[in-house]
């Protein structure tokens, strides 16, 4: 019988042989888009802090003040004593931003999706997922016990055909997608998805983790499709808003049920006061500075034009390399030039589609974007 350590070591060896082993690398972000690794300063194009708010003086001051008033942690589940006043204030602000009736805040985006889906789907139901949906959407569907049916990426015809085949035999149906896809940067056709859902009595879930704060003056991807009906608007506080946590915006009835039945809310400690206060301060900035929210996409589009890629739809630009080792080599070559662009490999992306995932911030200097484009252009031409 193999020991536990032998089992782990064997798996690590196989992953390393396939260039798929991942390791943590201590990284210090002191301010802006400059990070330090192994004593060397690099310009990062791998951070999701799209607006640079994680180090904004007003955001940091709000977090510090919240600690002074409420303490470092929430101390308990929200249903016990962890529902500090900042959480209801944050929920009201998020609901207003997303044009929803109500909102509930979770400890993270992952917890939001893995709490949401099992609350509204179970045995006898179906969950149809975009094949490229985020891992936490898949995890939530798996936890639910519902039948999981993937549909081809952004293919509403395929979705409609699957619903025509399976909807009548299911009690309820959820259709789940990213609003902005985290590895490809493209946007879901929420208007068409909504129409298909309405025609087939299905509930649409959109994960807008990478859209809020940077699209439609900060309102996110759903605001690009004002006619779309999206009963579940999920998102995070950890990217453009520079803090931490997740949320679901929905009707009051949906939110009330989540607050009493979502296991990841009921059995998790409430979001710390500092994180909630930081997110509130970030929302103030997003609402007051629409020009700031437009910068990440503008910089991404300047880059795609420079390297000969189609115009970016979001601040995320993938440069497909192919094999995992080749993507690692490309990342190391850019690091040697002073840029941190992390290689994304399977299983995060499909086999043969390892890539450089380039994330643009409002704080990236235009001259450095141009220099990065010069270095990346040969990889684009090679495809």
UniProtKB/Swiss-Prot annotation:
Gene3D superfamilies: Aspartate Aminotransferase, domain 1, Type I PLP-dependent aspartate aminotransferase-like (Major domain). InterPro entries: Aminotrans_II_pyridoxalP_BS, Aminotransferase_I/II_large, AON_synthase_class-II, AONS_Archaea/Proteobacteria, PyrdxlP-dep_Trfase, PyrdxlP-dep_Trfase_major, PyrdxlP-dep_Trfase_small. Pfam families: Aminotran_1_2. The keyword rRNA-binding does not apply. Transmembrane segments: none annotated. Belongs to the class-II pyridoxal-phosphate-dependent aminotransferase family. BioF subfamily. This is Putative 8-amino-7-oxononanoate synthase.
């Amino acid at each position: 019988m193999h020991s536990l350590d032998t089992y782990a070591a064997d798996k690590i060896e196989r992953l390393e042989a396939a260039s798929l082993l991942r390791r943590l690398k201590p990284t210090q972000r002191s301010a802006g888009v400059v990070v330090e690794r192994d004593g060397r300063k690099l310009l990062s194009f791998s951070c999701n802090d799209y607006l640079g708010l994680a180090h904004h003086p007003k955001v940091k001051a709000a977090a510090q003040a919240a600690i002074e008033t409420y303490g470092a942690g929430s101390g308990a589940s929200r249903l016990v004593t962890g529902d500090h006043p900042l959480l209801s204030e944050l929920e009201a602000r998020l609901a207003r931003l997303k044009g929803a009736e109500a909102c509930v805040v979770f400890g993270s985006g992952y917890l939001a999706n893995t709490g949401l889906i099992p609350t509204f789907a179970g045995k006898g139901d179906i969950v149809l997922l975009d094949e490229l949906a985020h891992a936490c959407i898949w995890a939530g569907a798996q936890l639910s016990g519902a039948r999981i049916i993937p549909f081809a990426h952004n293919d509403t015809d395929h979705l409609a055909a699957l619903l025509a085949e399976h909807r009548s035999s299911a009690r309820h149906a959820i259709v789940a997608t990213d609003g902005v896809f985290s590895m490809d940067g493209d946007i879901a056709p929420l208007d068409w998805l909504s129409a298909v859902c309405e025609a087939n009595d299905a509930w649409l879930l959109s994960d807008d983790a990478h859209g809020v704060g940077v699209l439609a003056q900060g309102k996110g991807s759903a605001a690009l499709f004002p006619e779309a009906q999206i009963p579940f608007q999920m998102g995070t506080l950890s990217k453009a808003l520079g803090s931490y946590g997740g949320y679901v915006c929905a009707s009051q009835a949906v939110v009330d049920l989540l607050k009493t039945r979502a296991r990841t809310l009921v059995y998790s400690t409430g979001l710390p006061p500092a994180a909630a206060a930081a997110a509130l301060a970030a929302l103030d900035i997003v609402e007051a500075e629409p020009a700031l929210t437009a910068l990440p996409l503008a910089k991404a589009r300047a880059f795609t034009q420079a390297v000969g890629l189609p115009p970016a739809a979001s601040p995320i630009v993938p440069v497909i390399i192919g094999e995992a080792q080749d993507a690692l080599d490309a990342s190391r070559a850019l690091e040697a030039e002073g840029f941190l662009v992390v290689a994304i490999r399977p299983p995060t992306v499909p086999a043969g589609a390892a890539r450089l995932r380039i994330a643009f911030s409002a704080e990236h200097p235009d001259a450095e974007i141009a220099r990065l484009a010069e270095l990346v252009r040969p990889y684009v031409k090679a495809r």
